[in-house]
Amino acid sequence: MRRSGSPEHPEPTGTPGRTGRCRRTAGAVAAALLLPALLSACGGPADAAPPDEITVMTWAPSGTGSADRPGMTALAGAVGHELNAGGGLAGHRVKVLTCNEHNTAEGATECARQAVAAHALAVVGSYSQYGDAFMPTLEAAGIPYVGGYGLSTPEFSSPFSYPVSGGTPALIAGSGQQLVEAGCKSVAVVRPDTRAGDTLLGFLAGALKPAGITLKDVKAPERSNDYTEIAKKAIGDDRAGSCVIVALGFEPTANLLDPYRRLQPRRTQLASVIGSFQQSVVDATGGDAGPLSGALATGWYPPESSQVWDVLRSTVRLHGGGVPIDVSDPGVQTTWVAYEVFRQAVERAGNGKQITTKALRGVLDGGEPIETAGATPPLSWGLTNMLPSADSPRLVNTAVTFQRVQGGRLVEQRAGFVDVRKVLAG
């Protein structure tokens, strides 16, 4: 974000969203849910915030364990502080609300209801796998969902969603292409034994098939304290040209690394995607002396060491209030990019004018590219930018980055972005 001024004790931008469920009768609940949708359809309060203030919401799970993303909501507050310290956004003070999504469908729905009740102009830089639960509520109120983490199908199909990355599909397709370039002869993919895991397998196969690379499917439980047998199956006979890609969540990936290290494969190339591990995990597992030394990684954005993130680091330092925020976390980076998109779109919607959700969506749908200072290619959600896919037409950013753990740091393996659009489009 652009800055002008950095007070040591910035004024809070808003109060955290409540996550408790109010006790109402069934009739009252139905009426409460119906009213915002009716009002927004008529251009009522759900469509317009107070003329001197912009309200925005960011949500993510907290207190759930491995799904927690506290850095995303913390960064949202820091960005709000920074914007207000510089005079606000397009002549308006910014009020940032946060909500604990609890990693449940009910929690996601409640957060969406709070956004409607608060007349939020947008939901920005949020994390939830329950798009089927929250998106209908936002759609009914006309509220755009800008820069979600990309965990659910509606984020790439709803006309009210504006994703800033290609989600897991782009990462997996990109990882497959990275392994092809690494000279892999066979690839074992360790992936969750779920429907989502089945989908990931398809994207990976699409990237490997043109090169004639053998793909071995290693299904793994999403939760386990011992992945020894999974690691053994993935490594196999540890012959030259063998590669293993870990496509699990953050916590199971960490649990898999321990038996992988003990097995000490000498010829197998390890690979994964940013989100399954990141710089903080490399540090925690021994850096260059750990199991991730030499590992390949595919990400949405440049590595944390890139100068692209200097402004993010400055925002955290000056406006984060001392709250720990891991700038190598792809969730934090996604929130950062999402707020940059939101900032520019609001400024284009009209400086000093009352800004509505309809006006904001009009800017985002207009097709004029939005620059993110190198964190992504220019982003645009115009019709000509849509992916030719019935399932994920809103997946407009098909670029990934190739990284590698070298000297204990995640660094660029190849400069710039790699486009995997052909793989994703089939």
What are these regions (language model features)?
Residues 51, 68-74, 87-154, 222-224:
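Beta-alpha junction/loop-to-helix N-cap segments that form part of ligand/metal-binding clefts
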Residues 321-328, 344-410:
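Segments of small-molecule ligand-sensing domains
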Residues 43-46:
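Bacterial signal peptide processing site
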Residues 159-264:
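Extracellular/periplasmic Venus flytrap/periplasmic-binding protein
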Residues 260-337, 417-421:
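Extracellular/periplasmic periplasmic-binding protein-like sensory domains
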